[in-house]
């Protein structure tokens, strides 16, 4: 299983003082050097953490894979096509939320989705949808032309005991179903050093995307050690 590191909260810390440090690009390079297989950033419409110049710097510097999380808007479609990350992930976005609160509502946007995706894929960019781990969302993602899905693990992260076990099984079944539908599978949201290890039991999940937990750990031990510790856990 591969590790993709979300560096949004490096930008959050920088923006707290509106100065140049810490630099998200430098953080991304440290993560790559330490074994991360990809870098994730979310260019939100309100630019609350990652900004346009960060994205340009990441595109110039990232050597593994750059995953641009974005809302389904004309502005973000244009930016994606101009920037050409290896991957874009469509996520829901609300101005009042602290972080992405759930999966992309494919049912609601389905009629526009294929047309939105088409020019992005034509630019040589893979497309992922951040979805709830259920068969209906997976079916619609496949029909819309998505290359892969990122299964939302937030509910798993918030639960404990038998409820968490049940949610894990839901994710396991969804991952297998997605692969059967011809989609590649990654997972993310709320994953941390305490709850990640069970995902080693789901071979269909090729990669996990981790941001807040890893950056929080890096505040104490540094990015290289935080990445290495997570890599040890995901095996």
Swiss-Prot record:
InterPro entries: Aldolase_TIM, PyrdxlP_synth_PdxJ, Pyridoxine-5'_phos_synth
Cytoplasm listed as a keyword: yes
Enzyme Commission number(s) of this protein: 2.6.99.2
Top-rank taxon, per record: Bacteria
Site residues, Transition state stabilizer: 150
GO terms of biological process kind: pyridoxine biosynthetic process
Active-site residues, record numbering mapped to chain: 42, 69, 189
Pfam families: PdxJ
Any one of the GO CC terms: cytosol
Subunit structure: Homooctamer; tetramer of dimers.
Protein name stated in the entry: Pyridoxine 5'-phosphate synthase
Gene (name only): pdxJ
């Amino acid at each position: 299983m591969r590790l993709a590191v979300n560096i949004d909260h490096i930008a959050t810390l920088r923006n707290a003082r509106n100065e140049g440090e810490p630099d998200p690009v430098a953080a991304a390079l440290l993560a790559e050097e330490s074994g991360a297989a990809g870098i994730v950033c979310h260019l939100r419409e309100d630019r609350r953490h990652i900004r346009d110049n960060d994205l340009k710097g990441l595109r110039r510097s990232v050597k593994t894979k750059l995953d641009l999380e974005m809302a389904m808007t004309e502005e973000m479609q244009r930016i994606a096509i101009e920037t050409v990350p290896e991957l874009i992930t469509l996520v829901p976005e609300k101005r009042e939320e602290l972080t992405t609160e759930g999966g992309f509502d494919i049912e609601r946007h389905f009629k526009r989705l294929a047309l939105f995706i088409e020019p992005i894929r034509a630019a040589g960019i893979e497309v992922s949808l951040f979805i709830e781990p259920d068969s209906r969302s997976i079916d619609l993602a496949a029909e819309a032309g998505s290359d892969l899905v990122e299964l939302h693990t937030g509910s798993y992260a918030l639960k404990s005991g038998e409820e968490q076990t049940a949610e894990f099984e839901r994710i396991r079944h969804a991952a297998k179903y997605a692969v059967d539908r011809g989609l590649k599978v990654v997972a993310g949201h709320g994953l941390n050093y305490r709850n990640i290890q069970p995902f080693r039991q789901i071979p269909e999940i090729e990669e996990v995307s981790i941001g807040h937990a890893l950056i929080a750990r890096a505040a104490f031990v540094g990015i290289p050690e935080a990445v290495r510790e997570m890599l040890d856990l995901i095996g």
